[in-house]
Regions:
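Short, cationic low-complexity segments
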Residues: 48-74, 128-135
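Acidic/polar-rich alpha-helix caps and helix-coil junctions
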Residues: 1-48, 82-246
Length: 246
């Protein structure tokens, strides 16, 4: 006990996924080290490559609570803005939408839309990104959770050049497992105690059970909120989300 601890804040949350070196990360229980030329991956390229990439669905977007903990209304009409400068000037941005939601959403997707006919360049103008290729996303909501601007674009946008470390077991998932177990046993207090650790890190209010109209699974409000937390915390985490769903 006490050997591991959650990283700090929304930025600490994202650092679990896009760090070039996870050594010393207090949340990591086990991770995989990547080094270009020895062992590499293509996760960043899958999120920013020149070919169209997959994106967040609108259904997933609406799973994120508002920043005050209330249920999302889905009424975002008239809240799109446009970028002021740079390559992306004049293109639609969703920064206001992200600011109104659970802060984890802004750590997971871009603040602007990118789709066919309206491509964008992430980290445009930053050192090492001068040759970055334009990217489009199937849904418009580009995945930025695993990306970082330090790796030059010639490696970021390559299937043999990504070297960010890969988390395997980390504390947040253990906390989610505890919360789910307590929820299944009907222990609301203990389930909430675990969920609130993650919400505090994200900058969200404590757990509040709500009668969500989106709950079409016939489960209790407690189970529904625990599953929401797991969905939001582990969004895009592939293997972890897959086993959560089956």
């Amino acid at each position: 006990a006490g050997q591991f601890a959650l990283t700090d804040g929304a930025e600490g949350y994202r650092a679990n996924y896009n760090s070039l070196d996870l050594a010393g990360n207090k949340e990591m229980i086990m991770y995989k080290k990547y080094v270009v030329g020895l062992l590499y991956h293509a996760t960043q390229d899958y999120c920013c490559g020149s070919t169209q990439t997959n994106g967040l669905s609108r259904s997933a977007f609406n799973a994120y609570l508002m920043k005050d903990g209330s249920l999302p209304t889905g009424d975002d009409k008239g809240r799109l803005g446009t970028a002021d400068e740079g390559y992306n000037a004049g293109k639609p941005v969703i920064i206001d939408l992200l600011d109104a939601r659970d802060p984890r959403l802004a750590q997971q997707i871009d603040g602007y839309l990118g789709y066919v006919g309206n491509g964008r360049i992430r980290y445009e103008g930053m050192p090492g990104q001068e040759t970055a290729a334009e990217n489009t996303v199937s849904t418009g909501y580009g995945i930025t959770k695993f990306d970082e601007p330090v790796t030059p674009s010639k490696f970021r946008q390559a299937t043999n050049g990504n070297e960010t470390d890969g988390p395997i077991f980390w504390l947040a998932e253990i906390i989610l497992n505890n919360a789910e177990a307590y929820a299944e046993l009907g222990n609301e207090a203990k389930a909430a105690e675990n969920i609130n650790k993650l919400r505090a890190r994200a900058g969200m209010p404590t757990l509040k059970l709500q009668n969500d109209p989106a709950n079409n699974m016939g489960v209790s409000d407690l189970i529904w909120e625990v599953r929401r937390e797991r969905r939001v915390e582990l969004m895009f985490d592939l293997n972890d989300r897959y086993w959560s769903l089956i």
